[in-house]
Amino acid sequence: MAKLGYKVEADPSKTAKAMGRTLRISKKHALEICREINGMKLETAVSFLNRVLALETPVPFKVHNKDVPHRKGKIGTHAGRFPQKATEEILKVLDNAKKNAEYKGLNTEKLRIKHISSNKGFIIKRFMPRAFGRASPKYQETIHIQVILEEFY
């Protein structure tokens, strides 16, 4: 497996990093969630994602919004969804980054998301048996998520 580095260079004394690899979530959902929470304070982002899990606040879909229904409320755009599986996985990666910050001695109340991105992972190839001895391919795409938290003053 190839070594996967971070896209952004950061000062190690003020930042904490975490990465989630080969997550079985939708790449479109991961892109929209990462775009929405990038630059937020960590506590604000976690509370936003918890509201998404509770089906209270939708994630605005600005890029992949074809056939996405409108949602009421002020979300910045009309189209939005509640991506449950991707939200849970991104919350786990954010929790790991917060624990890394605690280990490094950073103030966890003053952390903001400096960088978060989703990258395409490898494809898990499987086959579904069909009639008359044939088989159809069944592909499962995976996603890598990388997070850099920065302490602000």
From Swiss-Prot:
Keyword Lyase: no
CDD domains membership: Ribosomal_L22
A GO MF label: structural constituent of ribosome
Any one annotated GO CC term: cytosolic large ribosomal subunit
InterPro entries assigned to the protein according to its UniProt record, in alphabetical order: Ribosomal_uL22 (IPR001063), Ribosomal_uL22_CS (IPR018260), Ribosomal_uL22_euk/arc (IPR005721), Ribosomal_uL22_sf (IPR036394)
Ribonucleoprotein as UniProt keyword: yes
Disulfide bond entries: none
Keywords: Ribonucleoprotein, Ribosomal protein, RNA-binding, rRNA-binding
UniProt xrefs under Pfam families: Ribosomal_L22
Record-level GO BP terms: cytoplasmic translation
Family the entry assigns: Belongs to the universal ribosomal protein uL22 family.
Function statement: This protein binds specifically to 23S rRNA. It makes multiple contacts with different domains of the 23S rRNA in the assembled 50S subunit and ribosome.
Subunit and partners: Part of the 50S ribosomal subunit.
Protein name: Large ribosomal subunit protein uL22
Organism: Methanococcus vannielii (strain ATCC 35089 / DSM 1224 / JCM 13029 / OCM 148 / SB)
